[in-house]
């Protein structure tokens, strides 16, 4: 018999697989069947579908070691270093979660739970963007005509999955080229002229 934690892990792994394969069998009853438990048992662990999808995205982050990926950014000695490391961490993560992101984005228009899960993930990215902007501002290198909110909006928009898709999938940029160009664009958009590499 599986422990509660083992069951939760199995539920999250199964939900992840369902999302990545873009299966339309993603209702709570479908997930329960795929896991091999009753729907009632699934609801004991995750009372709502939104909670299940959000927990799944957080599980993916844990498995993919997102916190470790962000360590360089969080420990950076300057705002510009933080910006660079954050863009590399965030941009480098997109290809690994792309299948799941496509599924949630496709479902969100007609699926409140999927929309909530996707929005929660995007707010986490926005929080990282805001931290990078604050570090740049603290160093006195943020463009004087940008507020923290506007600068965060700009960086958050640059780092969207949709932009990655356009440049890497449609325009066939390499992942490395994408990350380098996003850093360059972020510097142009956010930093006072002449302060990029100081």
Please give the residue ranges for each predicted region.
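N-terminal intrinsically disordered/low-complexity leader segments
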Residues: 1-6, 198
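Helix-turn-helix
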Residues: 10, 14, 18-51, 55
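Short, basic, alpha-helical segments at the C-terminal edge of helix-turn-helix-like DNA-binding modules
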Residues: 28, 57-65
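Short helix-capping/turn signature of helix-turn-helix
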Residues: 46, 106-111
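Hydrophobic alpha-helical connector segments
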Residues: 68-96, 152
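Amphipathic alpha-helical packing segments from all-alpha helical-bundle domains
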Residues: 92-105, 113-139, 149-153, 187-188
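Hydrophobic/aromatic-rich alpha-helical bundle segments in the mid-to-C-terminal region
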Residues: 137-185, 193-198
């Amino acid at each position: 018999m599986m422990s509660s934690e083992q069951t939760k892990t199995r539920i999250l792994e199964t939900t992840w697989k369902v999302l990545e394969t873009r299966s339309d069998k993603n209702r709570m009853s479908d997930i329960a069947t795929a896991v091999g438990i009753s729907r009632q048992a699934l609801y004991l662990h995750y009372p709502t579908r939104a909670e299940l999808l959000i927990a799944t995205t957080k599980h993916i982050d844990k498995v993919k070691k997102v916190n470790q990926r962000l360590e360089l950014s969080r420990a950076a000695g300057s705002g510009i270093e933080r910006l660079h490391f954050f863009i590399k961490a965030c941009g480098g993560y997109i290809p690994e979660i792309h299948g799941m992101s496509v599924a949630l984005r496709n479902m969100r228009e007609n699926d409140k739970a999927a929309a909530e899960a996707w929005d929660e993930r995007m707010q986490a990215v926005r929080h990282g963007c805001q931290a990078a902007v604050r570090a740049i501002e603290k160093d006195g290198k943020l463009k004087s005509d940008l507020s923290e909110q506007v600068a965060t909006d700009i960086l958050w928009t640059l780092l969207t999955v949709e932009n990655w898709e356009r440049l890497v999938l449609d325009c066939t940029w390499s992942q490395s080229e994408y990350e380098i160009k996003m850093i360059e664009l972020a510097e142009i958009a956010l930093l006072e002229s002449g302060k990029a590499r100081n």
